[in-house]
């Protein structure tokens, strides 16, 4: 029996790349989305049943077109991993409001776009899973993270609300909230002071953060549960955080 389609956003690096490796190793057809398709195509994957599309999740039309293209080839999406995200550190007193908007658009509206695209068919066939990547910053505050924290609290709130709305149709909505991890999220930070504060905080924990592979294993664990079991949320962090 052929395996169903897995869609992963933000698949070029970090959590998304590691999630793609796990599902690829298990033989799932995949749609991998990201703005840096060259990096996705350079991943150590068997691309026989993998589509790679350049998509900005804030552009709902291109997002939907990519999913439609994949579903025409592999069937309906059974798992959407909303992994694309932006973290731009800064103090609200002086951070560029354009950075607030970028985080809200990607981290919140991008997630909603993906869910609105795939949920109608999941509800109709009474099956399917959406796993939203949030953060421990969706549960507690961190200095110089005000807008990012707001966006991730939003992901927590929308995930639980939509879970309540679709759970009666046997559709699972789950959430993974990682702590500090070794990804490329910090490469776009423009506030050097905020970045230095973050690095000092990381050093205070011994400099050890979460490996993206562990987050990928968590996503796979959630998905591999029977459809009648929904692990609503997993918070995961390095032991010393």
Residue ranges of model-derived segments:
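Conserved glycine-rich cofactor-binding loop
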Residues: 12-13
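Active-site helix of classical SDR
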Residues: 115, 151
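Conserved glycine-rich Rossmann-like NAD(P)H-binding loop of the short-chain dehydrogenase/reductase
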Residues: 26-41
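C-terminal helical subdomain
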Residues: 175-176, 195-241
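The beta1-alpha1 cofactor-binding region of Rossmann-like NAD(H)/NADP(H)-dependent oxidoreductases
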Residues: 54-65, 97
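Residue(s) in the substrate-gating loop at a strand-loop-helix junction
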Residues: 135
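Substrate-binding pocket helix/loop in short-chain dehydrogenase/reductase
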Residues: 91-92, 99-101
């Amino acid at each position: 029996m052929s395996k169903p389609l897995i869609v992963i956003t933000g698949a070029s690096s970090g959590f998304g790349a590691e999630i793609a490796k796990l599902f690829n190793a298990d033989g799932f057809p995949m749609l991998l989305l990201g703005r840096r398709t060259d990096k996705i195509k350079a991943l150590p994957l068997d691309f026989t049943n993998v589509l790679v599309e350049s998509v900005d999740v804030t552009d709902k039309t291109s997002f939907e077109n990519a999913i439609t293209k994949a579903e025409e080839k592999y069937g309906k999406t059974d798992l959407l991993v909303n992994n694309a995200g932006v973290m731009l550190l800064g103090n609200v007193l002086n951070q560029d409001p354009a950075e607030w908007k970028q985080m809200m658009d990607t981290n919140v509206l991008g997630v909603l776009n993906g869910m609105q695209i795939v949920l109608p068919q999941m509800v109709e066939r009474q099956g399917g899973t959406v796993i939203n990547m949030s953060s421990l910053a969706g549960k507690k505050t961190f200095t110089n993270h005000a807008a990012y924290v707001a966006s991730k609290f939003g992901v927590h709130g929308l995930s639980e609300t939509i879970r309540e709305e679709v759970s009666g149709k046997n559709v699972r909505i789950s959430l993974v909230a990682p702590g500090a991890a070794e990804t490329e999220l910090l490469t776009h930070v423009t506030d050097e002071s905020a970045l230095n504060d973050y690095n000092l905080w990381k050093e205070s924990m011994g400099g050890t953060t979460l490996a993206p592979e562990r987050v990928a294993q968590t996503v796979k664990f959630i998905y591999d549960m029977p459809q009648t079991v929904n692990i609503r949320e997993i918070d995961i962090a390095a032991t010393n955080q």
